[in-house]
Each structure stands twice: as C-alpha cells, then as structure tokens.
Regions:
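Aromatic- and glycine-rich beta-strand/loop motifs that create alpha-glucan
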Residues: 17-49
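Transmembrane helix boundary and interhelical loop/hinge segments in multi-pass membrane proteins
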Residues: 105-127, 139
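Terminal transmembrane helical anchor/hairpin motif
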Residues: 59-83, 221-264
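A structural motif at transmembrane helix-loop-helix junctions in multipass membrane proteins
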Residues: 38, 182-223, 228
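Short coil/turn motifs that cap or connect alpha-helices
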Residues: 40, 130-131
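Secretory targeting signals
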Residues: 52-61, 76-96, 137-196, 200-203
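Long, hydrophobic alpha-helical segments
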Residues: 47, 87-114, 146
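Hydrophobic/aromatic residues in alpha-helical transmembrane segments
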Residues: 104-108, 156, 194, 223
C-alpha cells in the first residue's frame, strides 16, 4: 500500500511538472517577462496611469455637480468616479475607450514579425512546438498583462475614491465595476488580436503597426462620419409613419454597433 501511495504521488508530481514545463506556458512566462521589462510597456502604463488619475481628480472635484435630485442613478454614488467629468478631461470610461485600443495594438503589433526578423522564430519552430501554440501563447501573455494592469488601475481608482469621499461602494456597485473591467479586457483583447493578425500578415513591424492604427482611426473617427452621412441621406420625411421611423433608427443603430467603440 505504501508503494502504491508513493507511486500515485510521484505520478501527480510528474503531471504537475509536465504542466509547468509545457512549451505553451514556457512561452507565456517568457512573453510576460519581456512585456514587463520593456520600456514600451512602462511608458504605456505611465501614460494610462496618469490619465486615469487625472480623470479621477476631475470626477472628485465635480462629483457634487454630477449628483442630481431627479437622477435615478444618484444612488450609485461610487460609480460616478468612473463616469463623472466637467468637460476639461474625459472620464475614466472614455479614457479606457480611447487608450485601450492603443494598449492592445502596442503589445501585439510586433508579436510575430519581430521574432521573424530577429531569426528566433525559426529556432522556436524547429523545436516540437506547434505554430498555433506560439501565437496563442503570445496572445495569452499579453492578455494577462493587460488584465492585471486594468484591474490594478480600476482598484486604485476605487481605493483613492474611497479615501476621498469616505463612502464605501455597495456590493452592486463593486460587481458593476468588476464586470466593467472584465468587459474592458475583452475590448482591448479585440485590438490585441487584430494587431497580432497584422503581425502575422506583414513582415515589417512598422507596417503592422500602421495597419492596426489605421483600422482604429477608421472606426474611431471616420466610421462615425460615414454613418452620419448615411443617416442624413436616408432620413425619413416628416410624413413617414412611426414604423418607418423606428426601422430607420434600428438600421442606424445597427450600423453604429459595427464599431467596437460603440459596442464598448
């Protein structure tokens, strides 16, 4: 019985070691280390942290004006820290909406082609490692870094807000903030995936970066203009029936929902 017990323990340890030493997780750990130690990531996290602290300061100075007696959302006081703004600086939500895509693009535009240009990709593929394993590991590593950073920033805003206003968030407010951060991670993951796709498609990192930024600019700036032109051209007349007006509004709303920022 003792020998059987020892054998079972050794098998479990062997399985645990195989999981730790799996090529996928080895690449993930290596990519996380590269991201955290890179100047690019430090500059990005510095910019995003400063802008988030600026939006928090704006929200704290205007939280009294943001609360209105006839506002049904006035009971969610803690959530105003993430949405309140006086117009000088955008709110925390708008900052994530604007800077989140840049974060995903910055961590993914050279994920594959940089390895190819340095000659390390062929060395990795010469090992018994599948091509998809490398791509997925790079995506998971960048997503882990993004998730940790967004959760840290979100809880920092919550902590400073708690110290400033002295009112703790309710359970509903807390879970709303957590779900918002999770949604933000999915939003940034879309742009990270897009950047990795362009990194696979183009050999030069500059080309993949420009392609990713071009798609981001199109949906952030030009797509809204195009939808407004379409809405103006298809605008129903004053004699239109309520059914036609509702169909028109649903069509325009469907067009706007094609933009990732609008869905976010």
């Amino acid at each position: 019985n003792c020998l059987i017990f020892i054998t079972i323990i050794l098998r479990k340890e062997a399985k645990g070691m195989s999981k730790v030493n799996h090529p996928f997780w080895v690449i993930v750990h290596k990519e996380i280390s590269d991201h955290v130690k890179s100047w690019r990531f430090l500059i990005l996290i510095g910019i995003i942290a400063l802008t988030c602290m600026g939006s928090l300061y704006t929200a704290l100075t205007n939280i009294g004006a943001a609360i209105k007696p006839d506002d049904p959302d006035s009971s969610f006081l803690f959530l105003k820290l993430f949405t309140a703004s006086d117009g000088t600086l955008p709110s925390f939500v708008l900052f994530i909406n604007f800077l989140g895509p840049l974060l995903g693009i910055a961590l993914g535009f050279d994920a594959v082609n940089s390895e190819q240009n340095k000659g390390t990709l062929s060395r990795m593929l010469s090992q018994p490692i599948h091509r998809d394993c490398i791509i997925n590991a790079k995506f998971v590593a960048a997503l882990i870094v993004i998730g940790i950073m967004l959760f840290v920033l979100g809880f920092l805003v919550m902590g400073f807000g708690l110290i400033a206003i002295g009112i703790p968030p309710t359970a509903e407010e807390f879970w709303r903030i957590v779900f918002f951060i999770i949604t933000s991670i999915f939003y940034v993951a879309f742009w990270l995936n897009l950047a990795i796709l362009f990194s696979l498609r183009f050999r030069q990192a500059a080309t993949s970066a420009l392609a990713s930024v071009a798609v981001w600019l199109f949906f952030s700036v030009f797509y809204t203009m195009i939808v407004n032109l379409v809405a103006k051209g298809l605008s129903p007349s004053q004699m239109a029936s309520p059914y036609q007006i509702i169909s028109y509004q649903k069509f325009i709303l469907g067009l706007m929902r094609l933009a990732p920022s609008e869905l976010f």
